[in-house]
A protein has these predicted regions:
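Bacterial N-terminal signal peptides
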Residues: 7-16
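Residue-level detector of conserved, function-critical positions
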Residues: 22-501
Length: 501
């Protein structure tokens, strides 16, 4: 896994994705990692005042009541030439008083692709010591594996480095999937680090608990002709490890727990249906594809496929709410917030609701895409005179509302790393041949001019930005709250793989 490097070059303001919910974080004053005049890192408030004095060699955002910091060992200096493999295990955890609660002798991973493991304030950190990994003299075979554990954000529990690996995409359950040295998976308690269900299941992408159940594969100790260990049918267990019986010929679906008391199941004919969390059949297997139930504008629904190109939306009892032929994609309709988009004519894209009704159609020369509504009920659309096969940076984006009215013309470049946060969209504008970043507000107006070389989403009222060799935080008016200078250009989370032609 990619290590979490906590230096001045990594400041991520990411959006929570949900997770462990039995503990909640009391609302406290937001703290932001910042570099002081002494070159060390501490934490400022929204006014730019240091509440935790600069004393660390690196710092990350607080998650709940804890943050990961770095303290380099004597003699180590991080530079652009530093090889990743030579970076020491020098990360630990502090609380909101700045007190160290886990000594900086570990390496942490928080997640990737803009997603935290289990949610920003509700998830875990993946913890290890890479220095424990020992290779042979040719560096081809490991002589000793590094051990892995977790730090639980809500409870503040550190499990210790007790396993070969863990599955960090935790759910809202108290149990974390862990993997032992025999490559079997079991479950540990997030709040104590103690084993609850012994490691006895197939360990390939182990299931988290959802709705009180998880789907697991029991290991078949018989080996096939290639010498690989097999696995039996997938079934359900509860949080004590007790198996939940399913009807004959019915198997649980791996990765799935109970969503709204519905567990996806499959029969011997490979058709999908649904049972409840007690293992009772609710919707007879009849679909060639199926999805988990989720909240939508039509209530709690799931998208299913009856036959080739024949898709529908069902409720919790299997009643068909809508059904239509959809030929444009092998995996069927992709609803987001209850809507999907479709190319309906030359230079025309339409927004459709879950009943297949057209909300609006947008006809523009060279239009190549239309997005689904964001939290502010606006949709991005993209125009590209060269067609839809060109690189993303050659497209220009605009915004349209739910009435099909264009809020801003397609004149902006939209970074693929950014979403919508606290009323602002990050956009890119070409100025004198250089890409500069700024922010649009909900009206589509340029609220903060495109003057930044790097920019992050707003989080708790501030956004991290960079201008040349200066970086720091701005408020929602674009005012500099706290900035510092650096000698070398930092690593940028905003990157472009190619130059515009």
């Amino acid at each position: 896994m990619k290590r979490l490097l906590l230096v001045c070059v990594v400041i991520m303001c990411l959006v929570p994705v949900g997770g462990w919910a039995e503990s909640s974080v009391t609302e406290v004053e937001p703290l932001f990692p910042a570099c002081g005049e002494n070159g060390k890192w501490g934490y400022i408030n929204r006014e730019g005042d240091f509440l935790i004095q600069p004393q660390f060699d690196g710092a990350s955002d607080f998650r709940g009541n804890y943050a990961v910091i770095a303290v380099y060992p004597d003699g180590f200096t991080l530079t652009e030439e530093t090889d990743w493999a030579s970076i020491p295990d020098c990360e630990g955890v502090i609380d909101r008083n700045g007190s160290i609660v886990l000594q900086p002798t570990y390496s942490f991973d928080a997640g990737y692709d803009g997603r935290f493991y289990g949610g920003k304030d509700t998830g875990i950190w993946y913890v290890t010591r890479w220095r424990d990994l020992v290779w042979d003299e040719n560096e081809e075979e490991s002589l000793q594996e590094n051990r892995v554990g977790f730090f639980d954000i809500p409870s503040g529990c550190f499990s210790g480095l007790n396993w070969r690996d863990i599955w960090p995409w935790v759910s809202d359950s108290r149990l974390v999937p862990v993997i032992d040295d025999t490559f079997r998976s079991g479950y540990a308690d997030r709040t104590t680090g103690e084993m609850v269900i012994p490691c006895q299941y197939e360990a390939t992408d182990p299931s988290c608990f959802y709705g009180g159940v998880a789907s697991v594969f029991a290991i078949d100790e018989d080996y096939d002709e290639t010498g690989n260990r097999g696995r039996s049918a997938c079934y359900l267990i509860d949080e004590t490890g007790t198996e939940i019986p399913l009807p004959d010929g019915i198997h649980a679906v791996i990765y799935e727990g109970a969503f709204f008391d519905r567990v996806m199941i499959q029969d011997d004919a490979k058709l999908f249906g649904y049972a409840n969390a007690s293992g009772q059949l609710v919707i007879t297997p009849q679909y060639i594809r199926a999805n988990s139930f989720e909240e939508t504008p039509l209530g709690v629904t799931a998208v299913v496929q009856f036959s080739d190109q024949d898709w529908g939306v069902i409720d919790l009892e299997g009643e068909i709410l809508t059904r239509e032929i959809i030929a444009q994609h092998w995996s069927g309709p992709h609803f987001y917030n209850g809507y999907r988009t479709e190319k309906t004519d030359v230079n025309t894209y339409s927004l459709l609701n879950m009943l297949g009704e057209t909300v609006f159609s947008l006809t523009i020369d060279h239009i190549v895409s239309l997005g689904t509504p964001m939290e502010n009920s606006l949709c991005w659309f993209a125009v590209d005179e060269k067609g839809d096969e060109t690189h993303w940076y050659e497209r220009r984006y605009g915004l349209v509302n739910m009435q099909g009215e264009i809020i801003t013309d397609a004149v902006w470049i939209k970074p693929d790393f950014s979403g919508y946060s606290e009323g602002y969209h990050i956009i890119v504008q070409m100025i004198d041949g250089q890409r500069k970043l700024g922010y649009l507000d909900n009206s589509g107006s340029l609220a903060i001019p495109c003057v930044f070389d790097d920019a992050d989403d707003f989080d708790n009222g501030l956004a991290f930005v960079r201008i040349g060799n200066r970086c720091g935080y701005i408020d929602e008016n674009g005012r500099e709250v706290y900035f510092w200078e650096f000698e070398e250009e930092p690593y940028s989370d905003v990157s472009y793989d190619d130059e515009e032609e």
